Amino acid sequence: MKLVLFLNMGGATNLQDCEVFLKNMFNDPYILGIKNRFLRKFVAWIITKARVKAMQENYKKMGGKSPLNELTQSLCNKLNLKQDEFKFDFVNLYVPPFATEILQKYTLNESDEIILFPLYPHHSCTTVTSSLEVLQNEISKQKIQAKVKTIDIFYKNELYNEMIVSHILDKKSKFDAKILIFSAHSLPQSIIDKGDLYEKHVNDHVEILKEKLKDHFDEFILAYQSKLGPVKWLEPNTSDVLANLNDKALIYPISFCIDCSETIFELGMEYKHLAKCDYDLISCPNDSDEFMEFILNSINSPLARKTSC
């Protein structure tokens, strides 16, 4: 068996899971860098209690759940129907399905292969490293002897970028804007200062896409969303850019592969109330045919590259 596991943070599928998501996220040492486990757990509890009601209210505006799980499951289902060489499934970091239950579904031995596929085009210790560490620890814990490979850092992949360009131009044909905003999930500046590769990868990716799209837009803007707390984060903020922009714009969520609360609610709803300009949002790759083509191409000629922090 060749088992491909997509890795993501996950999205709450009901209002109760909002608390589960927050608790697990802020207990992640790559997210909340407090070395003392007990102190980190206490601080995580405080943050969770402070934020859970607001998160639940936001989720109510999306119908009470994130679309991430359903879209990822649809992607797996389509890929499993499209071919029979690989079996596709997915694991979330902070809400079900967790690594333990997914790995227990399969009987794996030394002749089998597990391909870990974090659904993040750019590397960060807060996403890719954290996800891979959890999976590799669980594989060891369950004494699984299968060979393990990793797909990591795919923002330079030509198929992937052709897909993005196609999706952007398709949206532009229906909403003619001369400004394209690349919105990436922000990170605290302190994480970048410790050597995290994320900002460099995002900047590189924007330059690649600008070159491909330079004849279609007059202006490109890179901005960062989802800032949390009083510390310094990567800037400029997407919300600030929209609040000060006069002309129509398109937004592409460059750091996301699957639509989630950050795209559907934050970019699609919340920022509409802050924006000075008219804008439209381009969907993530999700379960599109082009994304499936890229995935199958990647696992057949692996782009695997180990990156440590």
From Swiss-Prot:
Keyword hit for Cytoplasm: yes
Q: Its pathway?
A: Porphyrin-containing compound metabolism; protoheme biosynthesis; protoheme from protoporphyrin-IX: step 1/1
What keywords tag this UniProt record?
Answer: Cytoplasm, Heme biosynthesis, Iron, Lyase, Metal-binding, Porphyrin biosynthesis
Q: What class of enzyme is it?
A: lyase
Answer yes or no on keyword NAD.
Answer: no
Q: Where in the cell is it found?
A: Cytoplasm
The UniProt catalytic activity note for this protein reads:
heme b + 2 H(+) = protoporphyrin IX + Fe(2+)
The protein's predominant localisation is cytoplasm
Q: Where does Fe cation bind?
A: H185, E262
SUPFAM superfamilies reported for this sequence? Chelatase (SSF53800)
Q: Which GO terms describe its biological process?
A: heme biosynthetic process
> What Enzyme Commission number does this protein have?
4.98.1.1
According to the UniProt entry, its GO molecular function terms are: ferrochelatase activity; metal ion binding
Function comment: Catalyzes the ferrous insertion into protoporphyrin IX.
Q: According to its UniProt record, which protein family does this protein belong to?
A: Belongs to the ferrochelatase family.
NCBIfam families for the chain: hemH
The identity of this protein, by name, is: Ferrochelatase
Species in which this protein is naturally found? Campylobacter jejuni subsp. jejuni serotype O:23/36 (strain 81-176)
